[in-house]
Every structure is written in structure tokens, then in C-alpha cells.
Design a protein with these regions (language model features):
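N-terminal charged helix/coil linker that caps or initiates catalytic domains
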Residues: 1-27, 60, 247
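Conserved N-terminal Rossmann-fold NAD(P)-binding element of oxidoreductases
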Residues: 29-30, 53
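Hydrophobic/small residue at the entry helix of a nucleotide-binding pocket
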Residues: 34
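Hydrophobic residues within alpha-helices
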Residues: 38-39, 82, 130
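Aromatic pocket-lining residues of Rossmann-like dinucleotide-binding sites
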Residues: 42
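Glycine-rich phosphate-binding loop and adjoining beta1-alpha1-beta2 segment
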Residues: 47-90
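A structured beta-alpha segment of the ubiquitous adenosine-cofactor-binding alpha/beta core
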Residues: 75-127
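Glycine-rich phosphate/adenylate-binding loop
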Residues: 105-247
């Protein structure tokens, strides 16, 4: 416990909260700018098991904001490099990897063993797939995203049917939304958004209350805004939740 001794005096965490963190299994979708920051704090804070899901390789354009990787890692699988770095950071955490693009059927196999899912991917289609799978399994999950000088984060509770789901918030937005290579991303904003997601994750796992709604960060004005989200009674994802089919 010495490694985590700074957590122990904190009201609402203490030894029991740290044990809940230690006993938790988290799936992380995407190990890019957001995912690197999330993974570092989850592992350094003692999450028991972390499953990394990413099929991409390290490119030079990643290095400014994806802080688990180095120049010597170019061309290697991100999950491979991240696992090595995270194991060196804290060998007490079991890190495992999925190195292909995860689809709905993969998520329905991976997520049942998880206490929490974090989506740090860079596309709307993947987030919708995570939303569908977590709704079916009633698994809590965190959405985090960033672009330009803006970041977003939201903790979703599919086990609470009165709460909105991801599609309730974003509707039928196309998968042609702007991305970081096209619109740009200020490197520290990826870190701020990722560490904020790690905060939400660790607080949730430890049993601390976390604020509901969508939380939006604007680095240009250095302001956070929290938005209340209403459930859409006609949402095609959460208005008729199907039981999972796990093969």
C-alpha cells in the first residue's frame, strides 16, 4: 500500500476505496493521445487489470501528444509499446492487449469481465458500438474526446435506465465528423481530457460520487461547462435494450 499511500487519507477513498481500485478490471478503447494519459494514471494508481484495445501503430505525428511512445517506437503496435511502458510503471497491474479493430461482437466478449469501459477512440462509429454493447451488458462507461482546444467527458450508467445514453446526446451525427489530423489538436488538451477521464474512472471505481451530464472543456478561455442531458424516449439504442448475445 505504500505506493498508494497518498490516496489513503482521502475522504471517501481510504484503504477500502484503494482495494476497489485494485480489484477492478478496465477496458480502454484507443491508446492515442487520450488513451495514453488515461492508461498512465489508471496503472500508476493501482487498477488491477487493464485491457488495451488498439490496432494502430506508432507514427511520428503521434509523438507530440501520445506520451507513452518514443522515436524508437515508430512502426510498432501501440498496444505492444504501451504494455511495456505500463508494466515498467507498475508491475502490480496486469496489462493485456487486443491488437485488432474491435467490433460489436468483440466488445460483447471483452466487456462482461470489466467493471468499467473507457472509450478514448477517435471516431463516432466506435463510440456508438461501445454504447450499444455497454447498454446490452449494463456496464458503466466513460466517453472522452478532444479536438482543437476543446475536450469532452461523460460517465454513462446503462444500469440506470432513467439516464441518457451516448446516442441520446449525439443523435445520428455522421461518421464524417472532424478529426484531429484535419482540425488539429493542442497536445496538452489531450492530456487534460485524458487525465480527467482517469479521474472520473478512479473516483467511480473507488466509490466516490461523480457529477452527471456532459462536461466540456475550452482551453482557449480555460473554462469547464457541465451540461444536463435528458433521455430521448425515441432513442433507437436505449429505448429498446436487447439482451446481449455472447458467443
Amino acid at each position: 500500500m505504500l505506493r498508494y499511500s497518498a490516496h489513503l487519507p482521502l475522504k471517501g477513498i481510504g484503504a477500502s476505496g484503494q482495494k476497489r481500485i485494485r480489484d477492478a478490471h478496465v477496458a480502454l478503447i484507443g491508446v492515442g493521445g487520450l488513451g495514453c494519459a488515461v492508461a498512465q494514471y489508471l496503472v500508476s494508481s493501482g487498477v488491477g487489470q487493464l485491457t488495451l484495445c488498439d490496432f494502430d501503430t506508432v507514427a511520428e505525428s503521434n509523438l507530440a501528444r501520445q506520451i507513452l511512445y518514443r522515436q524508437s517506437d515508430l512502426g510498432r503496435l501501440k498496444t505492444e509499446v504501451a504494455s511495456e511502458t505500463l508494466n515498467a510503471l507498475n508491475p502490480e497491474t496486469r496489462v493485456q492487449s487486443v491488437t485488432h479493430r474491435v467490433a460489436d461482437e468483440d466488445m460483447l466478449k471483452i466487456f462482461p469481465a470489466c467493471d468499467l469501459v473507457i472509450d478514448a477512440s477517435d471516431n463516432y462509429g466506435t463510440r456508438l458500438a461501445v454504447n450499444r454493447s455497454c447498454l446490452a451488458l449494463k456496464t458503466p462507461w466513460i466517453m472522452t474526446s478532444c479536438i482543437r482546444l476543446e475536450g469532452q467527458i461523460m460517465l454513462l450508467h446503462p444500469d440506470l435506465p432513467e439516464q441518457a445514453c451516448y446516442r441520446c446526446v449525439y443523435g445520428n451525427a455522421p461518421d464524417t465528423l472532424e478529426d484531429c489530423p484535419g482540425a488539429g489538436i493542442f497536445a496538452p488538451v489531450a492530456g487534460i481530457s485524458g487525465t480527467s477521464a482517469a479521474h472520473f474512472a478512479l473516483a467511480h471505481l473507488a466509490g466516490l460520487p461523480t457529477p452527471a451530464g456532459l462536461h466540456v472543456f475550452d482551453a482557449a478561455s480555460w473554462q469547464w461547462q457541465s451540461l444536463g442531458i435528458n433521455k430521448n424516449p425515441d432513442c433507437k439504442d436505449c429505448s429498446q435494450i436487447l439482451e446481449p448475445v455472447i458467443r
